[in-house]
Amino acid sequence: MKAISYARFGPPEVLEIGERPEPTPARGEVRVRVHAAALNPKDVLLRKGKMRWLPAGSLPRIPGYDFAGTLLDSAPGLPTGSEVFGMIQRNGGGASAEVARVPVGELAAKPSGLSMAEAAALPLAGLTALQALRDELGVTPGQRVLLNGASGGVGTLAVQIAKALGTEVVAVCSGRNAALVRELGADRVIDYTSEDPTAERGLDHVFDIYGNLPWPRAKAMLHSRGRYCTTVPQPGAIVRGALRRAGLHRAALVVVRSKRADLERLSRWVTHGALRPVVDRTLPWTDAVAAHEYLETRRARGKVVLTFDH
């Protein structure tokens, strides 16, 4: 099968475009013919060797977590040939190939109103936003939440999900992305190039998506019972997360989990017009090096997606 892989750690140029053996699904897994695979920062970190402490399998390795495609095997409630989307939980990934093996609990029926590229842009970023806002922060209608990094893959979905959950959204992004973020539903936009987001006070929640607003700076922005969540590990963040879930602390790290029920929740929002993924650019799988280079600029508005022709 056609696949993107790397046999050593390094810059985007270590990515190889070529043939790899088709995967054999284990018990509880199915094969998906991948039509589109979205990129995520985790792909970059693993390719660079920055997360070698994670059990991600041996090299060579096929990257990729987000996918949309068609089932080559039947899954519960989804016959062979069904259009599906999902996120592969295992650290080794494997979605950046013509065929991926996926646990049956990590995929769901593709929202009918989305293209394959749009559907592939939804899972990891959408699950991260949902699980941070709902589970780690516990947002409720009427609360005020600040989203730091509102124009990227997670951020564009977090704006919409926070609105769907009934909150007032204060979005932080650059001026060039302000119109997009307002269009997605933000109640107020802070242009970090001309305003200081940390001047905000009395917030119910701060969700640091971009990773440059650590807890020591963010806590002054919150009221006395306000909560903070980040996507980026910080010293003590995992411990604080456990304490926060026990009601003993106000800061947490979101660790995304691929769950069919949550994928279906995202899909329902899409169907009802409350959520749409934002795709910055779509490239053929053979342009994987260029796609990774662009993702590393951290300038993408929404997601970068690779497509496979079948």
What residue spans do the PLM features occupy?
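Mid-domain Rossmann-like dinucleotide-binding core that forms the NAD(H)/NADP(H) cofactor-binding site
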Residues: A120-D191
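C-terminal capping/lid region of NAD(P)-dependent oxidoreductase domains
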Residues: A274-V278, H292-H310
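Short glycine-centered segments of the SAM/dcSAM-binding site in methyltransferase folds
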Residues: E83, R144, E168, G226-R227
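NAD(P)H dinucleotide-binding glycine-rich loop of Rossmann-like/cofactor-binding domains
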Residues: Y65, F85-G149
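Glycine-rich phosphate-binding loop and adjacent beta-alpha segment
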Residues: N212-L275, T307-H310
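A short acidic, Gly/Pro-enriched loop at the edge of an enzyme's catalytic core
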Residues: T198-H205
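Glycine-rich beta-strand-centered segment in the early N-terminal region that forms part
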Residues: P21-L39, M51-N91
